[in-house]
UniProtKB/Swiss-Prot annotation:
It is found in: Plastid, Chloroplast thylakoid membrane. This is Photosystem I P700 chlorophyll a apoprotein A2. PsaA and PsaB bind P700, the primary electron donor of photosystem I (PSI), as well as the electron acceptors A0, A1 and FX. PSI is a plastocyanin/cytochrome c6-ferredoxin oxidoreductase, converting photonic excitation into a charge separation, which transfers an electron from the donor P700 chlorophyll pair to the spectroscopically characterized acceptors A0, A1, FX, FA and FB in turn. Oxidized P700 is reduced on the lumenal side of the thylakoid membrane by plastocyanin or cytochrome c6. Its EC number is 1.97.1.12. The PsaA/B heterodimer binds the P700 chlorophyll special pair and subsequent electron acceptors. PSI consists of a core antenna complex that captures photons, and an electron transfer chain that converts photonic excitation into a charge separation. The eukaryotic PSI reaction center is composed of at least 11 subunits. It holds the Pfam family PsaA_PsaB. NCBIfam families: psaB. It catalyses: reduced [plastocyanin] + hnu + oxidized [2Fe-2S]-[ferredoxin] = oxidized [plastocyanin] + reduced [2Fe-2S]-[ferredoxin]. It is a multi-pass membrane protein. Its main location: plastid. One of its GO terms (molecular function) is 4 iron, 4 sulfur cluster binding.
Amino acid sequence: MATKLFPKFSQGLAQDPTTRRIWFGLAVAHDFESHDGMTEENLYQKIFASHFGQLAIIFLWTSGNLFHVAWQGNFEQWVTDPVHVRPIAHAIWDPHFGTSAVEAFTRGGASGPVNIATSGVYQWWYTIGMRTNQDLFTGSVFLALVSAVFLFAGWLHLQPNFQPSLSWFKDAESRLNHHLSGLFGVSSLAWTGHLVHVAIPESRGRHVGWDNFLSVLPHPQGLAPFWSGNWAAYAQNPDTASHAFGTSEGSGQAILTFLGGFHPQTQSLWLSDMAHHHLAIAVIFIVAGHMYRTNFGIGHRLQAILDAHVPPSGNLGAGHKGLFDTVNNSLHFQLGLALASVGTITSMIAQHIYSLPPYAYLAIDFTTQAALYTHHQYIAGFIMCGAFAHGAIFFIRDYDPEANKGNVLARILDHKEAIISHLSWVTLFLGFHTLGLYVHNDVMQAFGTPEKQILIEPVFAQWIQAAQGKTVYGFDLLLSSSTSVASTAGQSVWLPGWLDAINNNQNTLFLTIGPGDFLVHHAIALGLHTTTLILVKGALDARGSKLMPDKKDFGYSFPCDGPGRGGTCDISAYDAFYLAVFWMLNTIGWVTFYFHWKHLALWQGNVAQFDESSTYLMGWLRDYLWLNSSQLINGYNPFGMNSLSVWAFCFLFGHLIYATGFMFLISWRGYWQELIETLVWAHEKTPLANIVYWKDKPVALSIVQARLVGLVHFSVGYIFTYAAFLIASTSGRFG
């Protein structure tokens, strides 16, 4: 008999008489493939419609950011003095605040308690030409309307008349053209337009708004140089080194330049360089989006491109033959590729946001820089682990050995032992040697002979930095040699600005590196390779291994196949993902520790502290972690509190959540099942309490679910703890 209970998408689960119904229902809510009566066409339609919901949420969120800053922030005051005014994210109202808390949180010129923004939105909005609260409100209302449009579009595409067909979803060439030209290309062109027409004039003290944007020329010659082919005119007369951002003082007329380096006052990339960059991307992508064959019978067919990719000698198999259908028919493969790309790009954003700051005055807001770097690195880690998870699901659910005979996928599976054992060798080598060096150095420090430490200069990395123009090492190579071909070729175009930037201590582009950097670099390499080993092994063994050849029949996540086979626990693809996330968090911990400590030393003008203490483990524990957590450990005491008290509490609370995770990770379900049965007995025997009864019989979580719950607590606690540490230690030092 059909039941109306949750989950509606699975009658089997809905009829389960235990609490398993709820937890399994939540676990498979997004696994559309497994839902009752799901067809391939319906699967694609559901996912397509959900994308609109995702976009609606994103636009609503950004709209909310704009709205709260316009309503409760101090954007107009901040614009007048970005160096000294602290940007306000929003007001705080809390009935628990005592007088000291109200005073501590009343900052940035506000009349009551507020949160300080560390997201960089003030710098971003200022750079792109916003100046007033009215600008922010207008943007907020516009984005809220866009959000509503996307919600409607999502609903519309679930209606029978507006649901695209399966063939439409499988039309790879049309989708590529649309995404390349339509999304990447045209949006980059639109952004160039905004920078040229609004942001650059505002940076030169000329307001452009809805009232005058059609009559204000972004360049004195208008479109004449474009039509006449004299494009160089747009690069002539750029802003000078003495340009005061936001005013006409020292400003020029150029709109598309190749100056290199940073604006001396704001320490951010030149707006005219960024406009040029986006224009170039727009041209490339709009051209790229016309390469694939659709309606007119011209252009490339992806299947033909892939089938032609066969190694010429014949000794390397069938190359990319069969890949078109394999990728085009597997959503997990496509998602894996997308996540791998987006994850890599997100990590690159983390690196670029501090080394090449695009937003005015971001370089002097140290807390925001640290927060943005850490935020993007953590997100990159989770996304990249997800790429391998979906790669493994592809191998279990979608991979067809017959359709991929001898091609690159089949060959990777055939060579998996070699791949996995090489990764294992690399991790062992990196781990033992790096730890060996650190521990040796610790022992030398402990025994009072620091001069006996093994300190290795990263000469290859310094050589690469010198080639890019860093002169401090005295290598006299390529761009660091004024007479080299590389230097003379770019001297009149982009080099003066770049060379000034790379050798200037005002920014953190190409940091000077030494033995401490060499060691932590290899520690991070160990973390990356170990994470990769676990993920790659999980995906390549997902279909089966010598130990368990029929593994794919058990699905993505199974605890084990009973006691009879011996040793089939902990080898599902999900278990590999689960283990890899711990290593990912561990690695990103080292990455963010390195970034943060290196920058704290630079920002304080005390690089010797990092250089001397980073070569041994006690240095990291004592001079980075302990020294910088002192304010948090003493956060609120009998003598009062301060604006860091909330972070001190968050630091404590993060540890608590993290520790709770181990309760799920170290015990198995038998313990909990016994405990639950005892509690059920007590409940049934207690007068009054036993009047209340449950519809679902309480049972313990499954092994797989408990691992997930433990992992989530571990991850959330880990991130809360480090976020509190990072923001408090940075803002406590620099205000």
